[in-house]
């Protein structure tokens, strides 16, 4: 990773716009705030990550699952009090490793002084055109991003209207930037030095955007098959099955059965190999879906 975190290129700016559209659709007001939280452990139960509002369980639950896997399989003589920030960081790196296509693309925040004017929201592409690579006008390059303690000090000096937690969706998205890394060791070092990004008010969203950027928006769209609905439900705020599958397996397929199924000539994609983390759902009991053996019998057996 380069020491200087460069400003967004036109291509990266378009990638972030496409990610926003794929996640939220045309309207993220209201739902956005439900997803605005960091990763934190419960005071009452040391092994549990806290979920503040309905919705972000599609990200928090997979991180929780990988946390437990690390504890049960990789920590001899474990205690649930061993689930600390370093293991949370390892769990997040495990998820990103599954999603990597060519390199790791970590989405982080610029400070207020570094934010250049953005093009109007009307320039955001429609979900149906997510594969298009139409260039958009790029503003002048902002200064390099500041992370870690330096970033925290800068944010503390800004007005309350610019503090994290008071941003509307547009203010949040105009502060995003992407850092490219080649190895998972670089990613882990970055999060070690900037754990405040994950624990801060937008930690869950920053991981979610990093997962999608690392996977690549075109790859996500190809695996989903259907992008007529956003990955986050516009009314209830929960994540789609495709998003959950991406977090657990690295593939954004929309179904939980084994392999692909042909339904009336339409190929519907499912899980194509044994998963490290199992998945079950009450929807199967109600006969809305069938969970295949790749999810039902996970690669790692606990107990």
Regions found by a protein language model. Give the residues of each.
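Cysteine-dependent deubiquitinase/ubiquitin-like isopeptidase catalytic cores across multiple families
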Residues: 2-53, 59, 64-66, 70-148, ...
């Amino acid at each position: 990773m380069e020491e200087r975190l460069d400003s967004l290129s036109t291509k990266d700016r378009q990638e972030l716009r496409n990610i926003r559209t794929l996640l939220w659709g045309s309207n993220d007001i209201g739902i956005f705030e439900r997803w605005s939280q960091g990763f934190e452990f419960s005071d009452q139960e040391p092994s549990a990550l806290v979920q503040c509002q309905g919705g972000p369980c599609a990200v928090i639950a997979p991180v929780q699952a990988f946390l437990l896997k690390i504890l049960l399989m990789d920590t001899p003589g474990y205690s649930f009090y061993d689930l600390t920030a370093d293991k949370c960081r390892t769990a997040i790196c495990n998820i990103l490793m599954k999603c990597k296509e060519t390199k790791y693309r970590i989405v982080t925040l610029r400070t207020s002084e570094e934010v250049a004017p953005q093009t109007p929201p009307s320039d955001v592409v429609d979900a149906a055109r997510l594969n298009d690579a139409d260039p958009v006008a790029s503003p002048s390059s902002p200064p390099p991003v500041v992370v870690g303690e330096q970033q925290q000090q800068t944010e503390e000096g800004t007005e309350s209207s610019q503090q994290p937690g008071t941003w509307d969706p547009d203010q949040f998205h105009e502060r995003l930037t992407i850092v490219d890394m080649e190895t998972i060791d670089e990613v882990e070092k970055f999060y070690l030095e900037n754990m405040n990004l994950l624990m801060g008010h937008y930690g869950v969203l920053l991981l979610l955007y990093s997962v999608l950027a690392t996977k690549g928006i075109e790859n996500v769209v190809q695996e989903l098959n259907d992008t007529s609905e956003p990955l986050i439900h516009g009314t209830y705020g929960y994540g789609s099955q495709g998003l959950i599958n991406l977090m657990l397996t690295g593939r954004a397929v929309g179904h939980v059965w084994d392999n692909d199924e042909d339904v009336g000539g339409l190929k519907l994609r499912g899980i194509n190999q044994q998963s490290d983390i199992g998945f079950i759902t009450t929807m199967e009991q109600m006969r809305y879906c069938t969970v295949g053996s790749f999810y039902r019998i996970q690669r790692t057996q606990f107990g």
